[in-house]
Swiss-Prot record:
Keyword line: Membrane, Mitochondrion, Mitochondrion outer membrane, Repeat, TPR repeat, Transmembrane, Transmembrane helix
Lineage: Eukaryota, Fungi, Dikarya, Basidiomycota, Ustilaginomycotina
Chain ranges on the Mitochondrial intermembrane side, renumbered to this chain: 148-152
Protein name in UniProt: Mitochondrial fission 1 protein
Membrane spanning residue stretches: 127-147
The organism of origin for this protein: Mycosarcoma maydis (Corn smut fungus)
Family matches, as Gene3D superfamilies: Tetratricopeptide repeat domain
The UniProt record lists the keyword Chaperone: no
Main location (coarse class): mitochondrion
Protein backbone atom coordinates (compact mmCIF):
# COMPACT_ATOMS: atom_id res chain seq x y z
CA UNK A 1 0.00 0.00 0.00
CA UNK A 2 1.40 3.38 -1.00
CA UNK A 3 0.75 6.24 1.38
CA UNK A 4 0.83 9.94 0.35
CA UNK A 5 3.78 12.22 0.92
CA UNK A 6 3.43 14.63 3.80
CA UNK A 7 2.53 17.58 1.58
CA UNK A 8 -0.38 15.61 0.07
CA UNK A 9 -1.68 14.73 3.52
CA UNK A 10 -1.91 18.43 4.45
CA UNK A 11 -4.90 18.78 2.12
CA UNK A 12 -8.18 18.71 4.04
CA UNK A 13 -11.26 16.80 3.02
CA UNK A 14 -14.32 18.79 2.06
CA UNK A 15 -16.99 18.99 4.78
CA UNK A 16 -19.22 16.63 2.76
CA UNK A 17 -16.40 14.08 2.36
CA UNK A 18 -15.68 14.16 6.09
CA UNK A 19 -19.41 13.86 6.81
CA UNK A 20 -19.56 10.61 4.80
CA UNK A 21 -16.78 9.13 6.96
CA UNK A 22 -18.39 10.44 10.16
CA UNK A 23 -21.81 9.03 9.23
CA UNK A 24 -20.33 5.60 8.53
CA UNK A 25 -18.48 5.68 11.85
CA UNK A 26 -21.55 6.80 13.82
CA UNK A 27 -23.77 4.20 12.13
CA UNK A 28 -21.38 1.41 13.09
CA UNK A 29 -20.93 2.86 16.57
CA UNK A 30 -24.71 2.85 17.08
CA UNK A 31 -24.86 -0.80 15.97
CA UNK A 32 -22.32 -1.72 18.64
CA UNK A 33 -19.44 -2.69 16.34
CA UNK A 34 -17.11 -0.29 14.54
CA UNK A 35 -14.75 -1.97 12.08
CA UNK A 36 -11.11 -1.00 12.27
CA UNK A 37 -11.24 0.20 8.67
CA UNK A 38 -14.16 2.54 9.34
CA UNK A 39 -12.46 3.91 12.46
CA UNK A 40 -9.21 4.37 10.54
CA UNK A 41 -10.94 6.12 7.63
CA UNK A 42 -12.70 8.55 9.97
CA UNK A 43 -9.51 9.18 11.96
CA UNK A 44 -7.61 9.79 8.70
CA UNK A 45 -10.18 12.36 7.62
CA UNK A 46 -10.06 14.09 11.01
CA UNK A 47 -6.25 14.26 11.05
CA UNK A 48 -6.33 15.94 7.63
CA UNK A 49 -8.65 18.63 9.04
CA UNK A 50 -7.53 22.19 9.65
CA UNK A 51 -9.41 22.30 12.97
CA UNK A 52 -7.36 21.33 16.00
CA UNK A 53 -10.31 19.72 17.82
CA UNK A 54 -10.96 17.40 14.87
CA UNK A 55 -7.26 16.56 14.57
CA UNK A 56 -7.21 15.69 18.26
CA UNK A 57 -10.18 13.32 17.91
CA UNK A 58 -8.47 11.71 14.91
CA UNK A 59 -5.25 11.20 16.85
CA UNK A 60 -7.25 9.64 19.69
CA UNK A 61 -8.94 7.17 17.32
CA UNK A 62 -5.61 6.30 15.70
CA UNK A 63 -4.09 5.73 19.13
CA UNK A 64 -6.90 3.27 19.91
CA UNK A 65 -6.25 1.40 16.65
CA UNK A 66 -2.49 1.43 17.24
CA UNK A 67 -2.93 -0.15 20.66
CA UNK A 68 -5.60 -2.69 19.76
CA UNK A 69 -4.70 -3.82 16.22
CA UNK A 70 -0.96 -4.58 15.74
CA UNK A 71 -1.26 -5.33 11.98
CA UNK A 72 -2.50 -1.74 11.44
CA UNK A 73 0.33 -0.07 13.37
CA UNK A 74 2.36 0.81 10.30
CA UNK A 75 -0.50 2.82 8.81
CA UNK A 76 -1.25 4.45 12.14
CA UNK A 77 2.33 5.57 12.76
CA UNK A 78 2.39 7.97 9.86
CA UNK A 79 -0.97 9.58 10.60
CA UNK A 80 -0.25 9.75 14.34
CA UNK A 81 2.96 11.55 13.49
CA UNK A 82 1.20 13.83 11.01
CA UNK A 83 -1.58 14.65 13.47
CA UNK A 84 0.85 15.54 16.23
CA UNK A 85 2.92 17.60 13.79
CA UNK A 86 -0.11 19.58 12.65
CA UNK A 87 -1.08 20.26 16.28
CA UNK A 88 2.47 21.42 17.10
CA UNK A 89 3.27 18.41 19.30
CA UNK A 90 6.68 17.98 17.71
CA UNK A 91 8.11 15.57 20.30
CA UNK A 92 5.23 13.14 19.78
CA UNK A 93 5.41 13.62 16.01
CA UNK A 94 9.12 12.81 16.08
CA UNK A 95 8.55 9.76 18.26
CA UNK A 96 5.94 8.16 16.00
CA UNK A 97 7.79 9.08 12.82
CA UNK A 98 11.04 7.65 14.21
CA UNK A 99 9.24 4.34 14.84
CA UNK A 100 8.09 4.31 11.23
CA UNK A 101 11.56 5.18 9.89
CA UNK A 102 13.06 2.49 12.12
CA UNK A 103 10.75 -0.08 10.50
CA UNK A 104 11.11 1.36 7.00
CA UNK A 105 14.31 3.40 6.60
CA UNK A 106 13.64 4.05 2.90
CA UNK A 107 10.06 5.26 3.38
CA UNK A 108 9.98 8.53 1.43
CA UNK A 109 6.73 9.55 3.06
CA UNK A 110 8.23 9.31 6.55
CA UNK A 111 11.38 11.10 5.39
CA UNK A 112 9.26 13.89 3.92
CA UNK A 113 7.31 14.24 7.15
CA UNK A 114 10.55 14.19 9.14
CA UNK A 115 11.71 17.26 7.21
CA UNK A 116 8.46 19.06 8.03
CA UNK A 117 8.77 18.12 11.71
CA UNK A 118 12.35 19.39 11.89
CA UNK A 119 11.34 22.68 10.22
CA UNK A 120 8.54 23.01 12.79
CA UNK A 121 10.96 22.37 15.64
CA UNK A 122 13.37 24.98 14.24
CA UNK A 123 10.56 27.51 13.77
CA UNK A 124 9.40 26.90 17.34
CA UNK A 125 12.98 27.37 18.53
CA UNK A 126 13.29 30.69 16.69
CA UNK A 127 10.03 31.90 18.19
CA UNK A 128 11.24 30.86 21.64
CA UNK A 129 14.52 32.70 21.16
CA UNK A 130 12.66 35.82 19.98
CA UNK A 131 10.40 35.70 23.04
CA UNK A 132 13.38 35.29 25.37
CA UNK A 133 15.19 38.13 23.60
CA UNK A 134 12.12 40.35 23.91
CA UNK A 135 11.73 39.50 27.58
CA UNK A 136 15.41 40.25 28.19
CA UNK A 137 15.05 43.63 26.48
CA UNK A 138 11.99 44.52 28.57
CA UNK A 139 13.78 43.40 31.75
CA UNK A 140 16.83 45.51 30.84
CA UNK A 141 14.67 48.59 30.29
CA UNK A 142 12.85 47.99 33.59
CA UNK A 143 16.13 47.56 35.50
CA UNK A 144 17.57 50.69 33.89
CA UNK A 145 14.43 52.61 34.89
CA UNK A 146 14.67 51.37 38.48
CA UNK A 147 18.35 52.26 38.66
CA UNK A 148 17.61 55.81 37.49
CA UNK A 149 14.93 56.20 40.15
CA UNK A 150 17.30 54.85 42.79
CA UNK A 151 19.89 57.51 41.97
CA UNK A 152 17.44 60.37 42.46
Amino acid sequence: MSLPYAADAETSLSPSELQVLKSQYETELASGHVTTQTKFNYAWGLVKSKQRAEMSIGVGLLTEIYRSDPPRRRECLYYLSLGHYKMGNYDEARRFNALLIEREPNNLQAQSLNQLIEKGVAREGYIGMALIGGAAAVASIAIAGLMRRGRR
